[in-house]
């Protein structure tokens, strides 16, 4: 018992103690090393558990551009990851809002799919010389292993290289952005692969 | 036997403290938030910077911009001291804006982020409509930063004076 309390000082002292203990008789050694060994085993298990817990909530590192899959249509779009944008936005062609339903098509390059989605809000955009109101809809997409439901503003982005901009409203769901990389994750949600 | 078992346990435990699996990876890159205070060197002007992975290049709010041959003269916004600067132009950047194509002078700046100095290229433009006087884009972030949008102002700029 006395040896065990001394041991709490640290690893090196423990080693010295082990040497000293080995010189003592066998019966006494058994008595000492069993509780000490057990205590270490317990500590090891605890550490492993804590480590695993930390990994479960781990931040996902993504690059400056990532492929995402728009659900439930399974359209793959390259997305620009933009920490400078407060909200996300989607390239919507031939946009028309009727009775709070936004009607638009995805760019031809990505399948030209016609979509009808309820408008959940409007975003005021201040451009350099004019004011604009853009409809906001909710979409579901798969980025890496995560299925994300998020609000996006719709506008014609034909002059820009990426059909989807992922802004801070999505990135705050525990992603970190590393600009040296792109396409770090391939979309791997269960919903993407299952029929 | 018991002694060897304990030693084995100890060494396994020791290796956890010596080589924590996650820490080793995190050390390579500095995590910063969406807004960071930086110092413009050598003038030590403190500016809040928007960390913007959507911007290919960094840019600085330059007022009363005047180009004279290979140099450019401009003022920092009044809110940040209104310092008059004269810097050599190292290039031009063509930017597509809603009003058409714009040509912006590019200069090299030394900035202090956290405890480290960086020389980085920024283009100059009047950003009076925008909240932050400095945008740090991907050309700067590739120096070893990762961006966590859940955080902001993670560092205080404090660089030791150059020898």
Predicted regions and their residues:
Chain B
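Positively charged n-region of N-terminal signal peptides that target proteins for export
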Residues: 1-5
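Bacterial N-terminal signal peptides
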Residues: 7-18
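Pepsin/retropepsin-fold aspartyl endopeptidases
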Residues: 24-163
């Amino acid at each position: 018992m006395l040896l065990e309390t001394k041991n709490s000082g640290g690893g090196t002292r423990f080693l010295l103690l082990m040497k000293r203990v080995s010189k003592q008789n066998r019966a006494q050694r058994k008595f000492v090393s069993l509780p000490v060994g057990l205590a270490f085993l317990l500590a090891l298990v605890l550490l492993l558990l804590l480590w695993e817990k930390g990994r479960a909530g781990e931040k996902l590192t993504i690059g400056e551009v990532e492929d995402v899959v728009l659900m439930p249509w399974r359209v793959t779009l390259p997305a620009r990851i933009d920490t400078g944008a407060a909200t996300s936005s989607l390239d919507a062609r031939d946009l028309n809002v009727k009775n709070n339903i936004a009607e638009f098509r995805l760019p031809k390059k990505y399948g030209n799919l016609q979509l009808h989605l309820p408008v959940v809000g409007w975003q005021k955009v201040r451009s350099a010389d004019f004011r604009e109101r853009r409809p906001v809809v909710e979409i579901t997409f798969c980025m890496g292993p995560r299925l994300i439901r998020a609000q996006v503003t719709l506008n014609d982005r034909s002059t820009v290289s990426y059909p989807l901009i992922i802004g801070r409203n999505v990135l705050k769901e525990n992603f970190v952005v590393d600009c040296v990389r792109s396409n770090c994750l391939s979309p791997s949600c269960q919903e993407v692969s299952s029929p | 036997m018991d002694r060897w078992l304990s030693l084995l346990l100890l060494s396994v435990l020791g290796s956890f403290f010596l080589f924590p699996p996650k820490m080793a990876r995190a050390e390579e890159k500095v995590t910063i938030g969406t807004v960071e205070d930086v110092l413009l060197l050598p003038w030590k002007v403190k500016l809040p910077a928007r960390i913007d992975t959507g911007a290919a290049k960094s840019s600085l709010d330059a007022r009363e911009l005047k180009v004279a041959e290979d140099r450019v003269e401009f003022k920092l916004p009044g809110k940040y001291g209104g310092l008059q600067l004269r810097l050599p132009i190292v290039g031009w950047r063509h930017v597509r804006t809603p009003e058409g194509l714009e040509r912006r002078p590019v200069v090299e700046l030394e900035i202090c982020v956290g405890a480290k100095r960086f020389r980085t290229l920024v283009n100059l433009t009047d950003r009076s409509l925008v909240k932050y006087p400095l945008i740090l884009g991907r050309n700067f972030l590739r120096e070893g930063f990762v961006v966590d949008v859940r955080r902001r102002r993670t560092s205080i700029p404090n660089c030791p004076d150059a020898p």
